[in-house]
């Protein structure tokens, strides 16, 4: 099975496309979500929400270093539920676009060890850079 984050089986070569074109594409989708805001609301990602989730990813990275990956893995998987809470399918106060929830779900689903988490954190950092570079606010 091909690794999601790496171009080799030893997980030493991070896929460049994740940090370049894919990161830029994700950032653009977060700024201009697929559906317009309105009744079926799909808001653009705010910098506050981006910082909230990115801050959580960085905090988990620190916890992994202190306590080990296996102990923190359930908290990593819980990022999906936090995204779901911020992106209800019906009613409620939708704080993040569907595209951002899909991004987090996809990333978290592919995290199986410490190396994968590091790759995810680096990929997220690239997305943050492109988000601001593409005019996110």
Regions found by a protein language model. Give the residues of each.
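Small/polar/charged residue-enriched interaction surfaces, especially the RNA/DNA-contacting tracks
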Residues: 1-137
